Amino acid sequence: MITSSRNPKIVRTRKLMQRKHRQRERLFRVEGLQALHMALEAGYEPVELLYCEELFAGEGAPSLLERFRKTRAELVSVERSVMEGLSGRETPQGLVGIFPFIDVELERLALEGNELIVVLDRLQNAGNLGTLLRTADAVGAGAVIMLEPCVDLYDPGAVRGSMGSLFNLPVVRMGDPEGLFAWLKEKGFRAAGADPYEGELWHRGDWEGGTALVLGNEARGLSADVRAFIDSWVRLPMVGKAESLNVSVVGGVLMYAWSMGNPVPGECA
């Protein structure tokens, strides 16, 4: 059992809170029973799992730990004070997994052309990214594509906000808008851009079939080089005094607008 916060494993895990160390190690942290469970269900295994049984509450953590014992992950027991200092949560659940980066290339996406693709243009807030990933997963999106420079996919806030959804759908990171939209057009996807003032109201938009929903930067919206490739625009009405809506709220409403136009058999349309 590790009893010191100066142990090299603990120091390395703590450093993974910083982007430069994540990039150097190509590793990221995952906390939370749900996120770790989703990782296993999706076929991803950590290279290392730090755990503190003293912090386990209920049956979820012990049973999850037993599942991790059957993987190739290195299991490391740590003292309570060490885990509490290591955790990014107010109430640690006693498990921290260290996972390798998940690399997804655009050309390797297995899509049929009738899905929803969510394109994020230079998003900067980790919490927004996590929420959008979770919502995209919930509506059954085929992929999320992040146009760089974007917030780090593996930022602890994004990982926490996604609640494990980053393991459930492919996320592509790239910096070539022209190449992306040429690929989308070739695959039969229409690009629908979200704009606060331009285009059809959200419920009147053409959502049928393959759609790339393009969401912009929190402060500046869509960049000029991305706007040039938009096929149609959609907007949400604002009748109060608020000047804008959070991008994760806009994204959530528009993703479900697409879902209503493409209902899953057995679900409410």
Regions found by a protein language model. Name each.
Residues 26, 120-124, 235-243:
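Short pre-catalytic strand/loop immediately N-terminal to key active-site residues, enriched for Gly-Thr
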Residues 41, 67-70, 76-81, 103-104, ...:
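RNA substrate-binding interface of SAM-dependent RNA methyltransferases
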